[in-house]
């Protein structure tokens, strides 16, 4: 009995856990710059080619090379702008009606007669039948209505080049306002030909696109149920 009371008390305590103790009274921390690009203590990117140096007494000025160079991102380390303009609407209305009725009658009959030593005869009829009936009904209805409108721009960096020339890009943006941190991430594979002349690309041109827009902080924690309640929801059969 004492163990049961202790278990119930522990569950109630877990239901009140809504935030991590180390985050109480603190604003969410920003991620390190270029954390996913392998940035070291010194400002150098691993695996990226170094910028060519300027030759002494050269007739060609490196500052003039951009006039003839394609401004679009093409090699690891280049930056391009991803334009996200999502305006999706979905209305789904599903209804199912299922009914099954099954009936069955199983029977049998017979007659018998017996005689005894005295010559007296006895007889009778036997009739046995079994009736079965089964009725099953199921009704379901579901309605989904969604509306999303997201318009953002984020700078992404080319992290790698595939053998066929396609580019792998990844971008991240974090903005902290008071104690709430807005996080925007984008990643995917793009074709160089889809990058426009002003070095921008639309989100619908990104293959294997991974776009996330959310946040973390006090407001996000309030919108989520406490950890204890989430555990109860996972194990509760009701």
Swiss-Prot record:
Keywords: Bacterial flagellum, Cell outer membrane, Lipoprotein, Membrane, Palmitate, Signal. It is found in: Cell outer membrane; Bacterial flagellum basal body. Residues 1-16 form the signal peptide. One of its GO terms (molecular function) is cytoskeletal motor activity. Pfam families: FlgH. One of its GO terms (cellular component) is bacterial-type flagellum basal body, distal rod, L ring. Assembles around the rod to form the L-ring and probably protects the motor/basal body from shearing forces during rotation. The basal body constitutes a major portion of the flagellar organelle and consists of four rings (L,P,S, and M) mounted on a central rod. Belongs to the FlgH family. This is Flagellar L-ring protein. It comes from Brucella melitensis biotype 1 (strain ATCC 23456 / CCUG 17765 / NCTC 10094 / 16M). The gene is flgH.
């Amino acid at each position: 009995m004492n163990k049961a009371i202790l278990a119930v008390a522990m569950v109630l305590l877990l239901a009140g856990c809504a935030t991590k103790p180390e985050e109480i009274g603190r604003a969410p921390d920003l991620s390190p710059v270029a954390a996913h690009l392998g940035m070291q203590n010194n400002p150098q990117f691993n695996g990226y080619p170094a910028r060519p140096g300027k030759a002494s007494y050269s007739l060609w000025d490196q500052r003039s090379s951009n006039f003839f160079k394609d401004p679009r991102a093409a090699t690891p380390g280049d930056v391009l702008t991803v334009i996200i303009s999502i305006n999706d609407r979905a209305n789904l209305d599903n209804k199912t009606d299922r009914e099954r009725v099954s009936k069955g009658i199983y029977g049998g009959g017979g007659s018998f007669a017996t005689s005894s030593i005295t010559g007296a005869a006895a007889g009778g009829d036997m009739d046995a039948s079994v009736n079965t009936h089964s009725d099953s009904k199921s009704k379901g209805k579901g309605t989904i209505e969604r509306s999303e409108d997201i318009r953002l721009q984020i700078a992404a960096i080319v992290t790698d080049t595939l053998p066929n020339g396609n580019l792998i890009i990844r971008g991240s943006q974090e903005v902290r306002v008071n104690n709430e941190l807005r996080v925007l991430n984008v990643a995917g594979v793009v074709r160089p030909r889809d990058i426009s002349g002003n070095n921008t690309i639309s989100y619908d041109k990104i293959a294997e696109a991974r776009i996330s827009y959310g946040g973390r902080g006090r407001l996000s924690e309030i919108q989520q149920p406490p950890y204890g309640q989430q555990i109860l929801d996972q194990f509760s059969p009701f």
